[in-house]
Regions:
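Alpha-helical segment proximal to the catalytic Tyr-Lys
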Residues: 166, 207-211, 269
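Active-site loop-to-helix junction immediately N-terminal to the catalytic Tyr of the SDR YXXXK motif
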Residues: 141, 184-192, 204
Length: 285
């Protein structure tokens, strides 16, 4: 992993939802850099937004640690999703993909049932799917975008957790929040609000599901180099993305995936109700 590549990301832009192959520089998802140690041996994981970026890195590292994986993705992301499935299967683990849009309760119930059918059960749920678009001021945020952002980012994890509550007894739920929940950017007004809501949801769920030994935690990434960035931000904002962190660079997806592996593993058996920041030094308090 060449971290120096991410100290000066050049200006670039993609059509939404973005493609991994078009990113410059190419991000590290752990394809070669991650060495598994059997920390998730035999576990079965459902990862939403698993086609690219953080979700792809979580899928790859989980597979390298011994887990079977189902990823959920939008139909528009089928090409990236298939690449991720092949990377999972290359580790000798079961990998499947389900195309869906998780903006309504029915779609989440159907995904839950399909994932259980494909893997025979679910031990780890990773709620990672997210939507964002940037605008310079509140008047520029279209109503339909705000609704979509909340439906995808907040309602989806709520409904999916509800559908898998019984399956996840003695299991683990990990929700992707963001440094934006703690230090919001005006250009991400709706997105930042959803991530703050997810922090609250994670803590609340940890309290409610603790008696059935379901651990619930959240990971709050900082600026991570994924297709979402050039697909939702202007070229000007992409130029030098992440260089404002104390570490002076954006993060690779695999650097965030390490937090998910820890929280899904037995090493985190007494960790629940927490938000773990992977932010390059940006504060999350």
């Amino acid at each position: 992993m060449d971290r120096a590549d991410l100290t000066s990301i050049p200006a670039q832009q993609q059509a939404w939802p973005g493609r991994t192959a078009e990113l410059d520089p190419q991000p590290d998802h752990g394809e070669q850099s991650w060495v598994g140690r059997g920390r998730l041996e035999g576990k079965r994981a459902l990862i939403t937004g698993g086609d690219s970026g953080i979700g792809r890195a979580v899928a790859i590292t989980f597979a390298k640690e011994g887990a079977d994986v189902v990823i959920a993705h939008l139909p528009q992301e089928a090409e990236d999703a298939q690449d991720t499935v092949e990377l999972v299967r290359a580790q000798g683990r079961k990998g499947e993909a389900v195309a869906t849009d998780l903006r309504d309760a029915k779609a989440n119930r159907e995904l839950a049932a399909k994932a259980v059918e494909l893997l025979g059960g679910i031990d780890v749920l990773v709620c990672n799917a997210a939507f964002q678009m940037t605008h310079d001021e509140i008047g520029e945020f279209p109503d339909e975008q705000v609704v979509r952002t909340f439906e995808t980012n907040v309602f989806g994890p709520f409904w999916l957790t509800k559908a898998l509550e019984d399956e996840l007894r003695d299991g683990s739920i990990i929700i992707t929040t963001s440094v934006q929940a703690f230090s919001p950017s005006e250009q991400l007004l709706d997105y930042a609000a959803t991530k703050a809501a997810l922090n609250n949801l994670a803590v609340n769920l940890a309290a409610e599901l603790g008696p059935q030994n379901t651990r619930v935690n959240a990971v709050a990434p900082g600026p991570i180099w994924t297709p979402l960035i050039p697909a939702t931000m202007s070229e000007k904002k992409v130029d030098g993305f992440g260089s404002d962190t104390p570490l002076g660079r954006a993060g690779h997806p695999v650097e965030v995936a390490a937090a998910f592996v820890f929280l899904a593993s037995d090493e985190a058996s007494y960790v629940s109700g927490t938000v773990l920041g992977v932010t390059g030094g940006k504060p999350i308090f």
